[in-house]
Swiss-Prot record:
Mostly expressed in closed floral bud, pollen and flowers, and, to a lower extent, in mature siliques, roots and leaf primordia. One of its GO terms (cellular component) is COPII vesicle coat. Component of the coat protein complex II (COPII) which promotes the formation of transport vesicles from the endoplasmic reticulum (ER). The coat has two main functions, the physical deformation of the endoplasmic reticulum membrane into vesicles and the selection of cargo molecules. May contribute to COPII-coated vesicles formation and ER-Golgi vesicle transport. Together with SEC23A, essential for pollen wall development and exine patterning, probably by regulating endoplasmic reticulum (ER) export of lipids and proteins (e.g. sporopollenin) necessary for pollen wall formation. Keywords: Cytoplasmic vesicle, Endoplasmic reticulum, Membrane, Metal-binding, Protein transport, Transport, Zinc. It is found in: Cytoplasmic vesicle, COPII-coated vesicle membrane; Endoplasmic reticulum membrane; Membrane. This is Protein transport protein SEC23 D. Component of the coat protein complex II (COPII), composed of at least five proteins: the Sec23/24 complex, the Sec13/31 complex and Sar1. It is a peripheral membrane protein.
Length: 745
């Protein structure tokens, strides 16, 4: 569980917090195996015996004062009696995790019988859009073949297709059999019969270890639905060709109800991989894609505002059904046409899944993403709870979870991998703030309760017999991290303790929220105003602006680069980069609304360092493929020219670019050889990433370098009005300086 705060020394009261101009909060990556310093938890069992405070329900931890019979809660100060079993346990503190570490992970007893525990097999279902092209199906097949290699023995796999009909595959016999049920074309009607009546669920879900070859054979039989079949299926004459026929909404609704019948019996979590080649345009949940088009210019509608909200609550409601059925949906959209991910995204993010967007089948990383996603551990049925000491409390929470309807500051996460990150901001409980004199310090406690599927121990794949293949066990665990923070006695101490990457994380969450509610322009304005106010507060705090005749002097005195405070120095550059990011660029600059939604979903789950890389890419230079020249350059053409290095490596999180300058010595091998330092760096980056970044090699002077040059944002105008020499970031700072002057008058 990695936790990072915007400031490691908290403001003493609300006045100090407001005067700093900084967001106050933290990010947490609950299922990360280690903390932010690379240290793992102290592990143990009997999590249900961990003492809890009678007043605030916080868990006992190393910061609590303990005597023989009682303990003081480190969060609220309440004196709690110790039960007799705890007194006996704590007499030998060295063997007890909660006595030795403030970061613990304890096993919990499971509800239900031992039999139910061992029958919970991992279930995976691939739902494939066959109202698509051959290329789309070939890509999907290769992705699923990769997925089959990553699935653990004992897993069950189902294959379903959708178009104007739903196709269920039985792959447990000698040849694959498909049974179809037609989807009513209108947006109101449900299927004429339940999928369970078409094919019993346990006939549909096949054991992977015995049916892998037959699943692969079934995938090879997939063909795109023809326009003739669509028109015939829709009951139309042969001469009328019905375009469309992608009954995604009806298919998903039927599939969740189908799987839900065995939730808690055959499986504890079913993961559905939905492959979509375009917008749903048939049956329930069909989407009107005409809202994306030229008419926005003539209707004077703000496209940046109009295309961000969902046009129907259907998929949000469907996500609720998925959760109730124990289903988590990962949505893979492979399309360059407008698909309205603004409406579809809820199906994945609210059911605990991920949203992937690939604009073409040619260079798609879909197979690698599938394999990577299934190969990493995940927790499910998770509950996340943040508690604080009494002087302050959590304000807003951000991330892909849904709040508990009954309890405050309790979030449910359906499925959580080791990368998923959530954020909170804080506010003071009253005007008192923290005590300036007592030794008590602010405390934050994060509790994360989760379930994992543990495969049978000591059995290799080849040893798996049919009798043992189902013996996966569920394990319920409780992970707790308790942290104590210092308080800042003045604004310098706040500024000296800033973590700019976490500040960026909270800013990104807030501007995404603002742009969803009020449009991209409002999100940009919020960010701009924030930087102006922060710069003004900083100049005021350090007394950098002199007063003459009662008025503040010229803006030339204003320090807009935070030269007195190294921790704040990166922020203007990060804000500029965020304003240049497709997340906040204008529709008329050619930012596809689906790509914007994809970035919102991706950036909402990234840890602070990854997000920093996505907003302001890392650019380093090499003098040879084996020699690093400089570890960090600014994103400007000037930096390239002045460095004199022949090779540059740019890491933009989703894209990696190796650029050879036009003046590079022809004897330097291109592309870089596999055993060189640069390749090792690339491979390490790819290995540690949650998604598969696209790798591009470019030779300056020979290849089209546009994709690389687009990342050199510092000469670009912040509002996207083209390029100008010596403008961009410099003129942005001038503008901020003028606004700060006006603000401080």
């Amino acid at each position: 569980m990695a936790v990072r705060a915007t400031v490691s020394r908290f403001p003493i009261d609300s006045d100090a917090q407001e005067a700093s101009g900084l967001p106050w909060g933290l990010t947490v990556t609950p299922f990360a195996a280690k903390d932010e310093n690379g240290i793992g938890p102290a592990c143990g069992s009997n999590g249900h015996l961990l003492p809890r405070c009678e007043n605030c329900y916080a868990y006992f931890n190393t910061y609590c004062e303990l005597d023989q019979w009682a303990w003081n809660c480190s969060l609220c100060g309440t004196l709690n009696g110790l039960p007799s079993d705890a007194i006996a346990r704590y007499s030998n503190p060295h063997s007890i995790p909660e006595m030795t570490s403030s970061f613990i992970d304890l096993e919990m007893p499971l509800d239900g019988s031992e039999e139910e525990m061992t029958q919970a097999r991992p279930v995976y279902v691939a739902a494939i859009d066959i109202s698509s092209s051959e290329e789309f199906l070939e890509l999907t097949k290769s992705a699923l073949l990769a997925a089959l290699e990553a699935l653990s023995p004992g897993a069950l796999f189902g294959l379903v297709t959708f178009s104007h009909k739903i196709g269920l595959y039985d792959v447990q016999g000698p040849i694959p059999v498909v049974k179809n049920v037609f989807i009513p074309p209108d947006g109101e009607s449900s299927l004429s019969l339940e999928l369970e009546d078409v094919m019993p669920l346990l006939q549909f879900l096949a054991p992977v270890e015995t049916c892998k070859d037959r699943i692969a054979a079934a995938l090879e039989t997939l063909r795109p639905i023809t326009s003739w079949e669509r028109s015939a299926g829709a009951g139309q004459g042969m001469d009328s060709v019905l375009m469309g026929g992608r009954g995604f909404g009806t298919a998903m609704e039927a599939l969740f109800n189908y799987l839900g019948s065995e939730f808690g019996n055959t499986f504890a979590l079913a993961r559905v991989f939905a492959f979509l080649s375009g917008p749903p345009d048939y049956g329930r949940g069909q989407l009107d894609t005409s809202r994306y088009g030229e008419q926005y210019a003539s209707k004077r509608v703000d496209a940046d505002r109009a295309l961000l909200p969902e046009q129907t609550p259907f998929y949000k409601d469907l996500a609720t059904i998925a959760v109730q059925s124990g289903v988590c949906v990962d949505l893979f959209a492979v399309t360059n046409e407008y698909t309205d991910l603004a409406s579809l995204k809820f199906l994945s993010i609210e059911s605990g899944g991920s949203l992937f967007l690939y604009s073409s089948t040619d260079d798609s990383t879909l197979p690698q993403d599938m394999f990577r996603m299934l190969n990493r551990p995940y927790a499910f049925n998770c509950v996340l709870r943040l508690r604080t000491s009494t002087e302050f409390k959590p304000g807003n929470s951000f991330g892909h979870f849904f709040p508990d309807p009954q309890y405050e500051n309790l979030q449910h996460i359906i499925c959580c991998d080791s990368y998923a990150t959530y954020a909170y901001d804080f506010e003071f409980a009253d005007n008192t703030g923290f005590s300036r004199h007592s030794g008590e310090q602010p405390v934050v406690q994060i509790a994360f309760q989760y379930t994992v599927v543990v495969p049978p121990e000591g059995l290799s794949n080849s040893e798996m017999s049919s009798s043992s293949r189902g013996k996966h066990t569920l394990q319920r665990r409780l992970r707790i991290r308790t942290m104590q923070f210092g308080t800042a006695h003045n604004i310098n101490e706040i500024y000296d303790s800033v973590d700019h990457e976490v500040v960026l994380s909270l800013l990104v969450h807030k501007v995404i929220l603002a742009s969803l509610e009020d449009g991209v322009r409002e999100g940009r304005a919020l960010l701009h105003d924030w930087l102006v106010i922060l710069t003004a507060q900083y100049n005021d705090a350090f007394n950098l602006v002199q007063y003459k005749n009662g008025n503040k002097s010229m803006s030339s005195q204003i320090d807009i680069t935070f030269s007195q405070c190294p921790q704040l120095e990166p922020l203007p550059r990060l804000v500029f980069a965020l304003l240049r990011n497709p997340l906040l660029r204008f529709h008329e600059e050619g930012v596809h609304p689906d790509y914007r939604i994809y970035l919102q979903c991706l950036f909402s789950v990234l840890d602070p360092s990854s997000l920093h890389c996505g907003i302001y890419p890392a650019l380093m230079s090499y003098s040879t493929p084996d020699t690093l020249a400089y570890p960090r350059h600014s994103l400007s053409r000037a930096a390239l020219i002045t460095s004199g290095s022949p090779i540059f490596f740019l890491d933009a999180y989703t894209t990696l670019i190796v650029f050879y300058s036009s003046t590079a010595d022809p004897s330097i091998p291109f592309p870089p050889p596999q055993d060189c330092l640069l390749r090792q760096t690339i491979n390490k980056v790819k290995q540690e990433r949650s998604i598969t970044p696209k790798l591009v090699f470019i030779r300056g002077g020979r290849d089209d370098a546009t994709v690389f040059e687009n990342y050199l944002i510092e000469e670009q105008d912040v509002d996207g009005n083209g390029f100008a020499s010596a403008m961009g970031f410099v003129s942005f700072l001038d503008d901020i300086s003028q606004r700060v002057t006006e603000y401080m008058k």
